[in-house]
Structure formats: structure tokens, C-alpha cells
């Protein structure tokens, strides 16, 4: 059985490595200390501080495991390997809805780097899936929960 790969830019991988370091060197020791303090309160069966600290420990360990997996199976995507005007991971694309002047800007990132509020959409999202591989000037049909609409790719550039 082959493992899932996680396409991402080198910058995304470096960000994950920083998050992992923060979790291992700061958050994990903080949680361990909270558990130690909560244990000192005595009876663990009715110790809400202990339960909360154990829940946080499970959350932190889950994050560590998830990030380690993403780093281990990272597939670094070189956006320079595709045409300058082609949409790919590591590129920012400006699209205009056909029939309007409404423009949107998206940076295509691996799933680990997605942040919709910052305009970073996962390569696995329906919008990115429709755009990846297309070029400046192409018209693309986007399927969304709100309905289908057509966009024209106005500009593609490397994400900074």
C-alpha cells in the first residue's frame, strides 16, 4: 500500500517544520508541566484541571503526529517547473467572473498551507482543481455549493 503524498511548496514544508518545533519544544513541555501540577492536587477522578491537561496533551500529540506525517510524505512542488502563465501549486492566480468585473485572487497551496482568509486555497479544493493546469486567458467552469460559474484567468504569477 502506497502512502499518501502531500504536495506543497518548500516554504510550506519549512513552515510545518517550524510549527513542529514549536509544538515539541514549547507546547508539549507546557502541557506536561500542567499535568504534573494537576496531579499534585490529589484525587484524579474528580480533577478537572488534570482532565483538561490530558485532553490538551492528546490534542498536541495529535498535531505533532499529523505534521510529522505531512513532512515525511511531503512532495515538494517546484512552481518554476511549469510555464509562467500556468496555474499550479505555488502560483497566485487572478480570475474574473465571466459577465461581471468581479475579480478574485487565489494562491494555490498544498492542503497543509490552506488559509481561506488569507486567500490561500488548497490544491484539493474544487476551485483549485478546476484551475490547476490552465493558463492565462483560459475560461474555466467552477462548480461550487452555491452553483456553477465561469471565470477567465486574468493573470498567473509565482507566489511570493
UniProtKB/Swiss-Prot annotation:
TM region positions: none
GO annotation terms (biological process): DNA-templated transcription elongation; regulation of DNA-templated transcription elongation
Keywords in alphabetical order: Coiled coil, DNA-binding, Transcription, Transcription regulation
InterPro entries recorded: GreA/GreB_C_sf (IPR036953), TF_GreA/GreB_CS (IPR018151), Tscrpt_elong_fac_GreA (IPR006359), Tscrpt_elong_fac_GreA/B (IPR028624), Tscrpt_elong_fac_GreA/B_C (IPR001437), Tscrpt_elong_fac_GreA/B_fam (IPR023459), Tscrpt_elong_fac_GreA/B_N (IPR022691), Tscrpt_elong_fac_GreA/B_N_sf (IPR036805)
PANTHER family per record: TRANSCRIPTION ELONGATION FACTOR GREA
Protein's job: Necessary for efficient RNA polymerase transcription elongation past template-encoded arresting sites. The arresting sites in DNA have the property of trapping a certain fraction of elongating RNA polymerases that pass through, resulting in locked ternary complexes. Cleavage of the nascent transcript by cleavage factors such as GreA or GreB allows the resumption of elongation from the new 3'terminus. GreA releases sequences of 2 to 3 nucleotides.
Protein name in UniProt: Transcription elongation factor GreA
Gene name in the database record: greA
